[in-house]
Every structure is written in C-alpha cells, then in structure tokens.
Design a protein with these regions (language model features):
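Specificity-determining residues in the recognition alpha-helix of C2H2-type zinc finger DNA-binding domains
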Residues: 32, 53, 87, 101, ...
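A short loop-to-beta-strand structural motif that recurs across blades of beta-propeller domains
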Residues: 8, 50-54, 60, 105-109
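Short loop/turn segments immediately following the C-termini of beta-strands
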Residues: 47, 102
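Conserved beta-propeller blade signature
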Residues: 41-43, 96-99
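Short loop/turn segments immediately following beta-strands, especially the blade-tip
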Residues: 111-113
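Gly/Pro-rich loop segments of beta-rich domains
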Residues: 5-32, 60-87
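Short, small-residue-biased leader/transition segments that mark boundaries at the very start
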Residues: 1-3
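Residue-level detector of Asp-centered blade-edge/turn motifs that repeat once per structural unit
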Residues: 36-39, 91-94
Length: 113
C-alpha cells in the first residue's frame, strides 16, 4: 500500500496576484510548468504576469526575470528582460534557464553571471 501527502508549498488556492514572500503568503498569476536547478531551486514561468519566479527549497518566492505585468520582448539582464506569456522552463547543466516565450514565438535563454 502506497501512502503520500499533498500539501500547499507556495501560493494560495483562493487568491491570485503578484506577491513575493514565504510559502503560502506568496501569490501567483497563472503559474505554468516549473523546473529545478541543481541546488533545488524551482523556477516557475508566470504566464499571467510575464515573469519567471524563483522558489528556494525553503519556500521563499522572489522575482527571477521579467517585470510583473509588462509583456514584451527585451533581452538583457534578468530584471530588464521582458517576456510575453512564458509557458515552460528548463534548466540546463550550467544552470542557464531556457524559457518557452509563447506569444513572442521564441525560446529564450536566461543566464546569471
């Protein structure tokens, strides 16, 4: 017999929005398919806010790339980058992040030096 538990890790089921913070105090707007880096950080494309959010193994949620609510196409530093409905992320071996930027019709690469 298998037994498992399902528990809320980050965000709130009853309210969407954009709030960074710890665990269930954070809010998301249409999060999509996440990916994990080698350190256990989770990267979540936020379709509704055009951002990539980072969740640490302890549950701290922060902005990783993009500007909340600002759709567009801009390359550059993560805080200057603009996405248009990011849907999926993959973390490569060097910890660079590949983003399926849906409405820009592109695969984007995010690196932090």
């Amino acid at each position: 017999v298998c037994s498992s538990d399902l528990e809320l890790f980050a965000g709130g089921w009853d309210e969407s929005g954009y709030v960074n913070g710890s665990g269930v105090t954070a809010r998301f707007d249409n999060p999509r398919q996440p990916a994990f880096d080698q350190d256990g950080n989770m990267f979540v494309p936020e379709y509704g806010r055009h951002t990539i959010r980072k969740i640490t193994p302890t549950g701290e949620v922060s902005l990783y790339a993009g500007l909340p609510g600002q759709a567009g196409f801009t390359d550059g530093l993560p805080e200057k980058a603009r996405f248009n409905k990011p849907e999926c992320v993959t973390v490569y071996l060097d910890n660079s992040l590949y983003v399926a930027d849906r409405d820009n019709h592109l695969i984007r690469r995010v690196t932090v030096e």
